Amino acid sequence: MRACLKCKYLTNDEICPICHSPTSENWIGLLIVINPEKSEIAKKAGIDIKGKYALSVKE
């Protein structure tokens, strides 16, 4: 599993399908967003698409 360096979206791809930025295998923490419209944590993190996200990503 890889995390986007920009939006932190988790994917298996080397390029993020959401923002088209590079991804990294060096990430920690997991945030699963089911309903971004109602999630206070998603709003604070700037997430508006449901999915799995890393809490921290390094190159």
Swiss-Prot record:
Origin, by domain of life? Answer: Archaea
Instruction: Tell me the keywords, alphabetical order.
Output: Metal-binding, Transcription, Transcription regulation, Zinc
Q: Among the record's GO biological process terms, what is one?
A: regulation of DNA-templated transcription
Answer yes or no on keyword ATP-binding.
Answer: no
Q: Where, by residue number, does Zn(2+) bind?
A: 4, 7, 16, 19
Recorded hits in SMART domains, A to Z, give: Spt4 (SM01389)
Task: Recall the GO molecular function terms of this protein's record.
Answer: zinc ion binding
**InterPro entries named among the record's database cross-references:** RPABC4/Spt4, Spt4/RpoE2_Znf, Spt4_arch, Spt4_dom_sf
Which Pfam families does the entry mention? Spt4
The question of whether Metal-binding is a record keyword is answered with: yes
Q: Which family does it belong to?
A: Belongs to the archaeal Spt4 family.
Under HAMAP family, the record lists: Spt4_arch
- Functional summary from the UniProt entry: Stimulates transcription elongation.
| Summary of subunit composition and partner proteins | Heterodimer composed of Spt4 and Spt5.
**PANTHER family noted in UniProt:** TRANSCRIPTION ELONGATION FACTOR SPT4
| The name this protein goes by in its record | Transcription elongation factor Spt4
Native organism is Methanocaldococcus jannaschii (strain ATCC 43067 / DSM 2661 / JAL-1 / JCM 10045 / NBRC 100440) (Methanococcus jannaschii)
Q: What is the lineage of its organism?
A: Archaea, Methanobacteriati, Methanobacteriota, Methanomada group, Methanococci
